[in-house]
Amino acid sequence: MQATIHNEFLTLTVDTHGAEAVSLKNAAGEEMLWQADPAIWKRHAPILFPWTGKLTGGTFTANGKTYKGGQHGFARDLEHTLLRAEGDTIQLELRADDAMKAERFPFDFVLTSTFRLEGKTVHHTLTVQNPAAAAQELRFGIGYHPAFNVPFDSAHTTEDYEFRFDQPESPMILDASPNGLLSGRCYYQWKNANSIQLTDDLFANDSFCMAGLRTKTLGIYEKDTGRSVVCNVAGYPYTLIWSAPAKPVRYVCIEPWHALPGAETDPQEWSERAATACLAPGQQWETTLSTTFDR
């Protein structure tokens, strides 16, 4: 099922499968989200929960039992309950049930996704709650993975675009092995850079996971017109940029994360792995990604 909201600038459609934004159009009716061509990348803007990236060994252990887990968790692959779709807001919820705890993740949780339109900005808030009746603490990872159409129109090509910071940056890049797990190494790709030129080969070796950014915003800009899609990444310890290795580039992802993918040296025990947060029963945690579409 899908729900749609709109204002004078934006029309947003969210699917209950994965609580995923699947369409965002501007006032001219131009589609700004990637439309999930399965030959290139079959998603639009998935939610990453309860982990980001890959698990070491594709598994984790909790309470003496081993669980298998795919990339980026499972929230993106499940049906969420639509709570509200009116005015400028869409809200959905995913609750752990007995089957989920037996097969996927043995912890109680409530994940609430709230989309709100404000002018040309989409605010997407993720709230994680450990229910008061839960038997144990909740450890989790979480992140965003929106994909934006590039080029913005047929008159432009890949080289007409660049990523821009709002101040000079020398981001530390966390290196990943070919298997997608962090290697434990890091390097510097750009120094004192205000921008990163987009090319068809930029992501030939996969994504760039940037740590320690000081910038409040990171956006993709059309150089000759100034049109842009800009994400507020303030407060996120890690921000990734990525696109599938298709030529020419068809979309770019700007991905603020509160957790890292698995590392080659990670323990199997879930309680020993790094997490976004650890919530005692009755506690909750939330984050918001605000993205402005000036195009």
Q: What is the meaning of each model-derived region?
A:
Residues 101-153:
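Acidic, contiguous internal or C-terminal segments within carbohydrate-active enzymes
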Residues 14, 128-132, 243:
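Asparagine-centered strand-capping/turn motif at beta-strand->loop junctions
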Residues 1-8:
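Short, Gly/Pro- and small/polar-rich lid/capping loops
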Residues 10, 26, 72-84, 193-274:
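Acidic/His-leaning functional-site neighborhoods
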Residues 70-119:
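Extended, loop-rich substrate-binding clefts of extracytoplasmic carbohydrate-active enzymes
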Residues 8-66:
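Acidic-aromatic substrate-binding/catalytic surfaces of carbohydrate-active enzymes
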Residues 135, 139, 147-234:
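Active-site/ligand-binding surface loops and adjacent short beta/alpha elements
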Residues 14, 60-68, 126, 277-294:
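Short Pro-Gly-centered flexible turn/kink motifs
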